Amino acid sequence: MVRIQELTAALSLASVVQASWIQKRNSINACLAAADVEFHEEDSEGWDMDGTAFNLRVDYDPAAIAIPRSTEDIAAAVQCGLDAGVQISAKGGGHSYGSYGFGGEDGHLMLELDRMYRVSVDDNNVATIQGGARLGYTALELLDQGNRALSHGTCPAVGVGGHVLGGGYGFATHTHGLTLDWLIGATVVLADASIVHVSETENADLFWALRGGGGGFAIVSEFEFNTFEAPEIITTYQVTTTWNRKQHVAGLKALQDWAQNTMPRELSMRLEINANALNWEGNFFGNAKDLKKILQPIMKKAGGKSTISKLVETDWYGQINTYLYGADLNITYNYDVHEYFYANSLTAPRLSDEAIQAFVDYKFDNSSVRPGRGWWIQWDFHGGKNSALAAVSNDETAYAHRDQLWLWQFYDSIYDYENNTSPYPESGFEFMQGFVATIEDTLPEDRKGKYFNYADTTLTKEEAQKLYWRGNLEKLQAIKAKYDPEDVFGNVVSVEPIA
């Protein structure tokens, strides 16, 4: 009898919670309608499109979905969220690995920004880019409006907003710095729904936080970037290696010395690692002949068998297309691409011999192909003596990893997720985290770091803040307390407002 009473009470409570949830959603929608801000009704086609996360492993249910088309719309939507007492999250490209455009949890008012994608370049070659533009579309517009370019990543569907707020790493970073290094101003909506401009001279502390602080401080409606002239010649390349275990260790040691001391600024490099391969790839801001002169000595020094399997002279547009991997370049909305995966990341200084040996041993001992899943690792040459990224101090912007030589992305996905009926396996988390541990466990605490844009959803909020923002965390917390003391724009891992 007691169990029946307990069950009845639980069902009654669930009904009350559901009714309150529906009432809150209806209230927000009514407020948006009164402010003439577009929104999606629950269970509509638009709700299904915009309300489904890119990473289906971490899909959440928003309190409501607003679709602003101007800065004023964003401000009005923020006011509706404030009136309803819910947290508010901005979703640009929607590619956050932790679904932070949803807040990383149920119940946020989500602002779907991808209808705001305008890009314009003025006579001073300053690009004004709306907060919902994606990298591919932005690159095309910059080229079309005066042959301009911006340092950014390779995935065309990634939103400019999340990319720059987290850092903005890509194949031009070693030469031209992070995306955030080109940001000179922004128009933002604050947590009280007011609209302000930020730059080095206006709300400079908030401007500092927006450059690498991961979001959660304000909602950016427009970014302003300096740009550079798109180069006429870029050479893309791939070096294919056939290394045994011993050659892996020797090769990585040689590459580390070269990356730290010799690798020229005009070159970017990434090691693409999976169960069957370890290849080098990237871009060179120059011609193929000069690139061969750079690659051949380090290939010889690395030892083992290696071959230049691709060497293609192209231009800025051509190198963008090289790394699309079948994706559409010209993307605005609607965007309906999804994956089912777990990712992790790591930043680190020069590795000890112990760490390199442990990483190689783990790869050889544990990396057999897993049926129905595909894993890979991107090992980026991040810093070093000649890196443009490393030429800026760690505290000049909120991006806290400029002193780190290396950046890794670890990624494990389920291929046939549409027909998958089982949750992501616990063994997948353990496998990827095992790779990370081979390096992380050898590092002192103050040199451990992770890249926010390659989010690890298994971190606690305390762990995430410490690893994503390292020595800049305390300053970010103070700025958060100044501009968003009630954590209106917070998510499950964002910087907390601590004075």
UniProtKB/Swiss-Prot annotation:
The FAD cofactor is bound via a bicovalent 6-S-cysteinyl, 8alpha-N1-histidyl FAD linkage. It catalyses: beta-lactose + O2 = lactobiono-1,5-lactone + H2O2; D-cellobiose + O2 = D-cellobiono-1,5-lactone + H2O2; D-cellotriose + O2 = D-cellotriono-1,5-lactone + H2O2; D-cellotetraose + O2 = D-cellotetraono-1,5-lactone + H2O2. One of its GO terms (cellular component) is extracellular region. One of its GO terms (molecular function) is oxidoreductase activity. Its EC number is 1.1.3.-. Residues 1-25 form the signal peptide. Optimum pH is 10. Stable from pH 5 to pH 11. There is a cross-link at H95-C155 (6-(S-cysteinyl)-8alpha-(pros-histidyl)-FAD (His-Cys)). Keywords: Disulfide bond, FAD, Flavoprotein, Glycoprotein, Metal-binding, Nucleotide-binding, Oxidoreductase, Secreted, Signal, Zinc. Residues 58-230 form the FAD-binding PCMH-type domain. Binds 1 FAD per subunit in a bicovalent manner. InterPro entries: BBE, FAD-bd_PCMH, FAD-bd_PCMH-like_sf, FAD-bd_PCMH_sub1, FAD-bd_PCMH_sub2, FAD-linked_Oxidoreductase, Oxid_FAD_bind_N, Oxy_OxRdtase_FAD_BS. It comes from the Eukaryota. It is an enzyme of class 1 (oxidoreductase). Pfam families: BBE, FAD_binding_4. Optimum temperature is 50 degrees Celsius. The keyword NADP does not apply. Its cofactor is FAD. It is found in: Secreted. SUPFAM superfamilies: FAD-binding/transporter-associated domain-like (SSF56176). Substrate binds at Y97, T154, R270, Q378, Q409, Y454. Disulfide bonds join C31-C80. The active site is at Y454. Catalyzes the selective oxidation of C1 hydroxyl moieties on mono- and disaccharides with concomitant reduction of molecular oxygen to hydrogen peroxide. This results in the formation of the corresponding lactones, which typically undergo spontaneous hydrolysis. Glucooligosaccharide oxidase is able to oxidize the monosaccharide D-glucose as well as the disaccharides maltose, cellobiose, and lactose. Belongs to the oxygen-dependent FAD-linked oxidoreductase family. This is Glucooligosaccharide oxidase. It comes from Sarocladium strictum.
